[in-house]
Amino acid sequence: MLSVDLPSVANLDPRIAAAAAGSAVAVYKLLQLGSRESFLPPGPPTRPVLGNAHLMTKMWLPMQLTEWAREYGEVYSLKLMNRTVIVLNSPKAVRTILDKQGNITGDRPFSPMISRYTEGLNLTVESMDTSVWKTGRKGIHNYLTPSALSGYVPRQEEESVNLMHDLLMDAPNRPIHIRRAMMSLLLHIVYGQPRCESYYGTVIENAYEAATRIGQIAHNGAAVDAFPFLDYIPRGFPGAGWKTIVDEFKDFRNSVYNSLLDGAKKAMDSGIRTGCFAESVIDHPDGRSWLELSNLSGGFLDAGAKTTISYIESCILALIAHPDCQRKIQDELDHVLGTETMPCFDDLERLPYLKAFLQEVLRLRPVGPVALPHVSRENLSYGGHVLPEGSMIFMNIWGMGHDPELFDEPEAFKPERYLLTSNGTKPGLSEDVNPDFLFGAGRRVCPGDKLAKRSTGLFIMRLCWAFNFYPDSSNKDTVKNMNMEDCYDKSVSLETLPLPFACKIEPRDKMKEDLIKEAFAAL
């Protein structure tokens, strides 16, 4: 029998033994990477190193998170390599973890790409400890008072008249007209800009491009955020191409926002004041640099531009897909207000079915189906599990809005549910189960929520009063439903964005057409 003499451990070179032991430890740690610790909430099975990363692209992320919620419960965990992600799927969990413990869970995760783009000056993504967040948040809350919101109504009504006239004259270019109207309104509120009647080649086009760049940055930042070592590769070297793109985007954004703030300052120096937000930050700089003030003002556009425009488009999709709802809104308008006058902002409160329709669109197609993530500063406990310090915490807004435990027939479009209960939830459920977290939770609730709802509500009310919306059978891009598969861009995980679509828009009658023309001529 052949015998082989193997060296004993005692006879090994100490350097070889140390290297072998070190390699074994490294391999063990590598294999542990991505595994779920026993104290975490449950979640889908992991793979060594990857954790659950290999599962994240199987379907549109909000739907995937919701599928896991049905299997693993109201709070579950994911592992993305060495990162722990906690997903909240119930109103109770959100209130307990984000609202009641907001001082612990109110931070944002660090993103090398977003940080390079914002230069640490965007309060939406900055830590609660920074002066950017503290002074910026205070300034916005002090500005968006009830009296200030009331002061915007005349301009909101003007822009809605301009929009109706645009659609009357040029319905096929609906998306651009909606974009023009909303951006013109925002530029007035933030910078005191006069109403702009065109889009292309104007400050409105530049402002929209600047405001939507941060979404493109966030969508394309996965690589460097997952592998932070890429941040250390110098610009110009392989693997650092993202830095060139981000810097170009940043320079463009800063140029646009600085120019807008400069314009507001020049108007103030000339004795012209409109009560805009820029005047407030210029009057009370609180030690902030001009670039900080520019980013604070521009943050209004970052947050409000794309979201409100997408929501209005989703409302139009719903009107086309559900003509019975469109008729009910119009019948309510005619019955409550009559047929011979244009509705005004104050009429919104007299139209319960319209308000229910607006809420149902937000529930079924939330603009932000997965809220921007929070980060925990300390270990937390929930349901017998530990949510460790540094965990990234997501609110699954899509999942809560489509939860059959909360809503009857959650996949159906039924505005009537909001006429039965204030939250649209099943009759008999506690008010505490209100799943309306569309504008955030805890320390990160969007301060512009009321402004957004007031503006979009007025626009949709007047569009329904003025026009009928139909599928356009002569156009290949027409729509007849609002299904995710047919109508929405599922390549974007953190937004519910309607794909471009065509429709037919016709005035309801000659009297309304004449009223629109008269109102526009009077602007």
Swiss-Prot record:
Q: Which GO terms describe its biological process?
A: terpenoid biosynthetic process
Q: What is its EC number?
A: 1.-.-.-
The membrane topology term of the UniProt record is: Single-pass membrane protein
Give the required cofactors: heme
Give the metabolic or biological pathway: Secondary metabolite biosynthesis; terpenoid biosynthesis
Q: Which GO terms describe its molecular function?
A: heme binding; iron ion binding; monooxygenase activity; oxidoreductase activity, acting on paired donors, with incorporation or reduction of molecular oxygen
Glycosylation is annotated at 82, 103, 122, 295, 379, 423
InterPro entries per the UniProt record, alphabetical: Cyt_P450, Cyt_P450_CS, Cyt_P450_E_grp-I, Cyt_P450_sf, Cytochrome_P450_fung
State where the protein is found.
Membrane
Spell out the family assignment given in the record's similarity comment. Answer: Belongs to the cytochrome P450 family.
Q: What is its biological role?
A: Cytochrome P450 monooxygenase; part of the gene cluster that mediates the biosynthesis of pleuromutilin, a tricyclic diterpene showing antibacterial properties. The geranylgeranyl diphosphate (GGPP) synthase ple4 catalyzes the first step in pleuromutilin biosynthesis. GGPP is then substrate of the premutilin synthase (PS) ple3 to yield premutilin. Premutilin synthase is a bifunctional enzyme composed of the fusion of a class II diterpene cyclase (DTC) and a class I diterpene synthase (DTS), with the corresponding domains and active sites containing characteristic aspartate-rich motifs.
Q: What is this protein called?
A: Cytochrome P450 monooxygenase ple5B
